[in-house]
Amino acid sequence: MKTTPFTEKHIALGAKMHEFAGYNMPIEYSGIIDEHLTVCNGVGVFDVSHMGEFWVKGPHALDFLQKVTSNNVAALVPGKIQYTCFPNEDGGIVDDLLVYQYEPEKYLLVVNASNIEKDWNWCISHNTEGAELENSSDNMAQLAVQGPKAIQALQKLTDINLADIPYYTFKVGEFAGEKNVIISNTGYTGAGGFELYFYPDAAMKIWDAVFEAGAEFGIKPIGLGARDTLRLEMGFCLYGNDLDDTTSPIEAGLGWITKFVDGKNFTNRSMLEKQKAEGTVRKLVGFEMIDRGIPRHGYELTTAEGDKIGVVTSGTMSPIRKIGIGMGYVKPEYSKIGTEICIDMRGRKLKAVVVKPPFRK
């Protein structure tokens, strides 16, 4: 299994470790619910060094990105970030990702750990524009410091005014005595906070500084288990569950990152435009349980009469709401807010209702 610069630290701290995307990663420390609430109410730290990072540079960088991504990269300026996806030729999604505009002809792509090799091969094989591509996935470490107290803790470690970094923007500067750290107002939790990118040799210095700065706020290390419950409470999609090679961005409710602007002829644009105009055969919805039960990936969604209408893609017990919540694809006629549906949980039909995420208000 691959490791991150923090793997030994996780083991020393007693984390429950498990393989994820080929990496030995911490799943939980004190427990998923405790960690979830720590992030919602205070500050927690996630090792997300397993994520992939590609640089796209040169005079052809923008043309390349306009072709392979769904969002309008031309709308970015240096210091801004965009959520987007790589559409494939069959109407599905290769991956969802973030695009950082670093300089006028320099972009950073941050991709899912499970898709690094697939995404890299996709970029290489579609680079007919001649953009300069560089895979820096093994040369970057990343911590996500999340929660309402994150800004107070991190402000102690930099002269950059973190209040001047709005959501989905970033600055590059000195942090904890290390130069060229990317400080990004992003996250996968809905609790606020920052993501830090730095060289692996600075990893332990930055970890120790962050935990020292956050001690007065009860800072804790957080595992991937709580990362999943936090993102699901916000209704954020997870690749491999809610998105995959067969789900289109229009079906997944990602029309807002699919921009049909003049001159942007991205992969499979015409099919996605047709879907936007004519509708899709299924839609991703959020739902919460009426009956007691925890929905899980793969459970069937049915009508009260037992007719199959879809499938659960993500589900959990909400630590905040203390009810079962989930997402899944249903036939469009069952996607309206307030529609009652059923989840087939091992032969038991349990009632749920379609709602608009986030589940955590």
UniProtKB/Swiss-Prot annotation:
Entry keyword Amino-acid biosynthesis: no
This protein's UniProt keywords: Aminotransferase, Transferase
EC number of this enzyme: 2.1.2.10
GO molecular function: aminomethyltransferase activity; transaminase activity
Pfam families in UniProt: GCV_T (PF01571), GCV_T_C (PF08669)
Superkingdom classification of source: Bacteria
Gene Ontology cellular-component terms listed: cytosol; glycine cleavage complex
Catalytic activity: N(6)-[(R)-S(8)-aminomethyldihydrolipoyl]-L-lysyl-[protein] + (6S)-5,6,7,8-tetrahydrofolate = N(6)-[(R)-dihydrolipoyl]-L-lysyl-[protein] + (6R)-5,10-methylene-5,6,7,8-tetrahydrofolate + NH4(+)
Subunit structure: The glycine cleavage system is composed of four proteins: P, T, L and H.
Similarity section: Belongs to the GcvT family.
Primary role: The glycine cleavage system catalyzes the degradation of glycine.
Protein name stated in the entry: Aminomethyltransferase
Species per Swiss-Prot/TrEMBL record: Bacteroides fragilis (strain ATCC 25285 / DSM 2151 / CCUG 4856 / JCM 11019 / LMG 10263 / NCTC 9343 / Onslow / VPI 2553 / EN-2)
Biological classification of the source: Bacteria, Pseudomonadati, Bacteroidota, Bacteroidia, Bacteroidales
